[in-house]
Amino acid sequence: MYGIEYTTILIFLTSITLLNYMLKSITRIMDYIIYRFLLIVVILATIIKAQNYGVNLPITGSMDTAYADSTQSEPFLTSTLCLYYPVEASNEIADTEWKDTLSQLFLTKGWPTGSVYLKEYADIAAFSVEPQLYCDYNLVLMKYDSTQELDMSELADLILNEWLCNPMDITLYYYQQTDEANKWISTGSSCTVKVCPLNTQTLGIGCLITNPDTFETVATTEKLVITDVVDGVNHKLNVTTATCTIRNCKKLGPRENVAVIQVGGANILDITADPTTTPQTERMMRINWKKWWQVFYTVVDYVNQIIQTMSKRSRSLNSSAFYYRV
């Protein structure tokens, strides 16, 4: 009887000893593998110059901080450049290989093939509805047209500045603008905007709040409208909501990774809404050439000087980024 109990205890102790030995052996093997792997990673990290691809990933929204690539010092190898041009440019050039030619010319200025993107838009009005500025640096070419001067000015004001915007429910609420930086921005296929200022008794000043036909018309069938009214006064609004969206926006400051190059015209457009301030012409430039090849040649020649006036931002800028700040 005692012999059986002693044998059982001895087997139990032997099993524990063997299990402990096996666990220690496995631990030593795993430590050896992990340490060797880490050693190889450390050695390779000192040899290979890794690029942080996350720097150029598109991000929906808007961030103020400028991000620098910590693993590469070459300014253009980790940057992207978008050049936006009207469709009339490609129609005039009429060459299926012209983009490849332009890409090779940018290469002579230090911009590798694949880092420059040429993006076409139909016209100023169409570009205003859905501006998409995804690159680290964005250059927008605008052909001057005296009949579209105000449209060009509004578009430049939109893309050259950072806006914090919120949706507006104009069927339920009255709205007022608090200061000069506060604007109402409408975009869509057809925007007609009417306003009715209200007194302290919420009665219309020169209009009837129940009759939109008596409202003051500030825009008619436009694709982009930046509305500025008297600050501190409530307004009842009427907008063609079926084809247009209006938002209450606050201008936060310049969007420094965007520049506008005006093609033609006697003077650079002034996009400043406040008549008492100095004209805003930062990151607005002018090129006077009749032919589009001449325009593109000049852009290539001065591209590196132009981006010195800009700041690289690692973010994607589409229409939602203009309107919703993250």
Curated annotation (Swiss-Prot):
GO cellular component term of the entry, any: T=13 icosahedral viral capsid
Region annotation GPR motif: where it falls in the sequence: 253-255
Keyword DNA-binding found: no
InterPro entries in UniProt: VP7, VP7_1, VP7_2
UniProt xrefs under Pfam families: VP7
Highest taxon, organism lineage: Viruses
Residues bound to Ca(2+) 2: Q177, D228, V229, D231, D301
Gene3D superfamilies linked: Glycoprotein VP7, domain 1 (3.40.50.11130), Rotavirus outer-layer protein VP7, domain 2 (2.60.120.800)
Family indicated by similarity: Belongs to the rotavirus VP7 family.
This protein's name: Outer capsid glycoprotein VP7
Lineage: Viruses, Riboviria, Orthornavirae, Duplornaviricota, Resentoviricetes
